[in-house]
Amino acid sequence: MVKRLIATSGFIALLACSAFAQDAKTVIDNATKAMGSLKTVEYSGSGFDFAIGQNVNPTQPWPKFIDKTYKRTMNFDTPAFRMERTRMQGENPPRGGGQQPVVGEQNQNQTTVVSANTPWVQQLELWMMPQGFLQAAAKNNATLATRTIGGKKYSVLTFTGQNKAKVNGYINDQNMVERVETWIDNAMLGDMLFDATYSNYKDFGGVKFPTKIVQKQGDYPILDLTITDVKPNVAVNIQPAAAPGGGAAQVATSEKLGDGVYLILGGYAAIAVDFKDYIVVIEGPQSEERASAIIAKAKELIPGKPIKYVVNTHAHYDHSSGLRTFMAEGATIITHQVNKPFLEKVGTMPHTLNPDKLEQAKKKPSIETMTEKKVLTDGNHVIELYHMTGIGHHDGLIMAYLPKEKVLLEADAYNPQPANATPPSPPSPYTLALVANIERLKLDVNRIVPVHYPADNRVVTRAELMRWIGRANGN
């Protein structure tokens, strides 16, 4: 799935050296005239969105959600945009992550008012739109080339984005922007292709606007919209959303679970175990920053020993985006065999836009796999790793059981809500599967360590898990 993600220098060179009779300004002017100028726009329709990095296994597309209604308001003059949608479950039965299953209808709103601190990847929501691209191309001294794809000739405008990646826009012979592509940094995939295609243009009040929009990241769609209504150049009022509280960086903290066994919090949870000659870490999640904090805390708690293994519960990006940091550390990744080809590629993907520790270290990844069960022991400590069966979240989902401590670490099957929250009815099939696996394996569990640890840092017991699925007596 990753072969299209690599931006080859040959492709960029082809765009740069191709001669073309018109200059870039003429192409921009002609396209702007043909499409109509936009200062603001409000468009609406329906379609699908997809959760990147949350596929049921690494060979499958991102899981789908239904956008029953979708509306986006954009201001190109004073850069800002707002998205409003009503979202529903799209995978039945649930397959993959992305906070599935969605029960009923879920209303989502997102507002961005562009400032000097707005990440470029967010700004691209404006500047990859057809008219937005033309405006950005004009402001950033775009160059012009020509390219023929499938027998069709395109004028290709190129400028450099704030992240130093090329942004290419393909203008067809009708002077319509048909495709915009660029590359953005992804913790797993590195220099990842991000492209948007626009088709079925129609006239709305003198402005040509696509009625089909498809965005892709990581070779699979992340958005697929059919547009039914467009209001060009209307008055818009996009106000910044209220700033979320608690913006301070999280600090890694720890709790002793047993002799030589430590829970590391301050983000996604991990466990560090003091083996005789080395350290085992369970879970390398979120980001290089979080993985570095886990590594530092593990070495502080267990000084003088290397981290030999890191257990990966599954390949979803939020649970795997720290693995490259562990690879740079020299640790071997333990994962289910379904993930091995993908994680091997992850360990070798170029990260030139935002070089990480592995990009700098140039180390070859070391990966060990398991199928149904794997036991790690030094004769004192024991970690039992089990493949979870009957769960649609991920085909290679692993849970880690420490029999001596009667502790079970699990990811995404049970994400505890506030202590006074009402249990869902019906329970999530993922949580039911977790309980079924615990009972199938006859594990003597007292304490659950969810990787998505509760915000109040409370101890999560097996009894709490059982109550959450409606078995109030805890049995």
For each predicted feature, which ranges?
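Sec/Tat signal peptide C-region and signal peptidase I cleavage site
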Residues: 17-21
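Flexible, processing/modification-adjacent segments and terminal tails
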Residues: 22-27, 94-167, 172-173, 184-192, ...
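Active-site metal-binding motif and surrounding structural segment of the metallo-beta-lactamase
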Residues: 289-334, 440-446
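Gly/Pro-enriched, hydrophobic low-complexity segments
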Residues: 152-241, 398-403, 410-411, 416-417, ...
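N-terminal mature ectodomain segment of secretory-pathway/periplasmic proteins
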Residues: 26-116, 140-148, 288
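Divalent-metal (often Zn2+) His-rich catalytic cores of metallo-beta-lactamase-fold enzymes
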Residues: 214, 435-475
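Conserved beta-strand hairpin/beta-sheet module of binuclear metal-dependent hydrolase folds
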Residues: 255-297, 397-416
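Zn-dependent metallo-beta-lactamase
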Residues: 222-275
